[in-house]
Amino acid sequence: LYFHGLGEFFYLNGISVDENSFMYITTHGKKLNSTGKELNNHKVIVPVGGGKDSIVTLELLKEYEMDVIPFFVNPREASWRTIQVAGFTKDDCIVVERTIDRKLIDLNDKGYLNGHTPFSAMIAFTSATVAFLTGISNVALSNESSANESTVPGSKINHQYSKSFEFEQDFHEYSRKYLLQEMHYFSFLRPINELQIAKL
């Protein structure tokens, strides 16, 4: 996740690094099994960013008679307008507030390198936590097919790696193995492109 998610950051800053030596992650905690908690399969959490893709996902899932719950991290005014267009109110939503550690801001002020981080991966882990706490089994994203495409010609570097199908599959498997066995993390719009979404 970190290696591929920071691919564009490495490229723009001329940093040469390989996947095997980039980072070592160790833990000293006790191993825990994934929970067998039963989840509601008729409800779906939909992370909302504020664009047309989220509106389409919300509208289409309503047609399937799913209990749809919009989910926000630090919602903007555009985010609230999105759910209103889709026929939801603030009372229908789950909202998480996120703050950036002051130490990161201080490091930026001192001239340390700054760049894109895998924000959608943070959304993935946060929505999985919300799914567990609320007993909901489905998290439906609104990532479309172009999220898989490289943003640097002739490379596999993808500014949106954590929106890609590769990440989606990896996170789904990780969640079922270590977090929630019954959780389904998927992008509802993955098979279609932006033009097709605009038509919908």
Please state what every model-predicted region is.
Residues 10-44, 52-200:
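Nucleotide-activated chemistry modules centered on ATP-dependent adenylation/adenylyltransferase
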Residues 49:
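Metallo-beta-lactamase
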Residues 1-12:
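Phosphate-/polyanion-interacting regions in eukaryotic proteins
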